[in-house]
C-alpha cells in the first residue's frame, strides 16, 4: 500500500512541476531518490509518465493518459468531440493558437490546443491550470458563473502574477460585468507578460459555463484591429459549441458571459 501511495504522490508532483528531475521530485515529496526513481519507473511502465530525454538524467512529464482518464470522468470527451471541428475552423480564420479550457477546482484547465502556423506562438501544455482572475479563459468562466460563485471567488486571495494583474475585488467585479455585456474577455499580459488573449464562455444546457474558448497571441503581434476581429470570432465559435451541446449564448445580454484566455509563453520555432 505504501508503494502505491508513494507512486501517487510522485504522479501529483510531476503534474504540478513538469518537466521535473528526480532530485527535485525527491525534495518535493520528501522521499529518498531511490524510492522516487522506483515510483517513476513504475509509472512509466504503466503509461502515466515519460522522460523528455533518454537515460536516468531525463526530466519527467505526464503522458496523455491522465488527461484521457479525466475526460472520461467528467464527460469532456463529448465536449472535445463537439469543440475540435469548431476550433479548427476558428484557427483557420485567425491563424493564431486556439485553446479550450474547462472549469475545475477554482481554476480552468487546458484540455485542447490547436497551434498557429506562425513561427512565434503561444505554447501551453495540456492539463495546465490557469487562474480565474488573471487569464482570459478564467475570466470568461468566472463572468458566466452565478453571483454566488463569483462572490465566493472574490473573497479569496487574488494573487498577482504581473504588474497588470487585477487583484482588487471591486475592479474585478466591474470587469466581469463588462465581459457579460460584450460576450468576451481579454487578457493583456496579466498572467504572463508576453501573452495576450481573447476568450468567450461555452454554456451548457443548464446555462452554466462548461468550458471557455480562447484565441492566444504574443502581445507583440496584437493590434486593436486583430483584437476586435478575434473578439467576434471567438464569441461566435463559443456560441456554436454551446448550441451543439444544447446550451445558450456565451456572454451576451440575456445569456451569460464570455472570457479571457490564459497566458503562456512565446516560442519561436525553426
Which residues does each predicted region cover?
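N-terminal helix-turn-helix
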Residues: 1-81, 243-247, 268
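Amphipathic alpha-helical effector-binding/dimerization core
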Residues: 55, 61-156
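Cysteine/selenocysteine-centered motifs that mediate thiol-based redox chemistry or coordinate metal-sulfur cofactors
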Residues: 149-160, 235-270
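Extended hydrophobic
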Residues: 168-238
Amino acid at each position: 500500500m505504501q508503494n502505491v501511495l508513494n507512486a501517487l504522490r510522485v504522479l501529483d508532483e510531476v503534474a504540478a512541476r513538469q518537466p521535473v528531475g528526480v532530485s527535485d521530485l525527491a525534495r518535493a515529496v520528501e522521499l529518498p531518490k531511490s524510492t522516487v526513481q522506483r515510483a517513476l519507473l513504475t509509472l512509466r511502465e504503466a503509461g502515466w509518465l515519460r522522460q523528455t530525454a533518454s537515460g536516468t538524467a531525463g526530466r519527467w512529464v505526464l503522458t496523455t493518459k491522465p488527461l484521457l482518464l479525466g475526460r472520461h470522468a467528467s464527460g469532456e470527451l463529448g465536449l472535445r468531440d463537439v469543440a475540435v471541428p469548431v476550433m479548427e475552423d476558428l484557427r483557420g480564420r485567425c491563424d493564431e493558437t486556439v485553446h479550450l479550457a474547462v472549469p475545475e477546482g477554482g481554476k480552468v484547465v487546458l484540455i485542447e490546443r490547436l497551434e498557429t502556423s506562425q513561427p512565434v506562438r503561444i505554447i501551453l501544455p495540456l492539463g495546465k491550470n490557469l487562474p480565474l482572475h488573471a487569464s482570459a479563459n478564467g475570466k470568461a468562466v468566472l463572468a458566466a458563473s452565478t453571483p454566488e460563485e463569483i462572490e465566493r471567488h472574490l473573497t479569496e486571495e487574488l494573487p498577482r502574477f504581473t504588474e497588470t494583474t487585477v487583484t482588487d475585488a471591486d475592479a474585478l467585479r466591474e470587469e466581469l460585468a463588462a465581459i457579460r455585456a460584450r460576450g468576451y474577455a481579454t487578457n493583456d499580459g496579466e498572467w504572463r507578460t508576453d501573452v495576450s488573449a481573447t476568450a468567450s464562455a461555452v454554456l451548457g444546457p443548464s446555462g452554466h459555463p462548461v468550458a471557455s474558448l480562447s484565441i492566444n497571441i504574443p502581445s507583440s503581434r496584437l493590434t486593436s484591429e486583430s483584437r476586435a476581429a478575434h473578439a467576434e470570432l471567438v464569441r461566435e465559435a463559443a456560441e456554436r459549441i454551446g448550441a451543439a451541446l444544447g446550451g445558450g449564448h456565451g456572454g451576451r445580454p440575456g445569456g451569460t458571459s464570455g472570457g479571457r484566455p490564459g497566458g503562456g509563453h512565446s516560442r519561436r520555432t525553426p
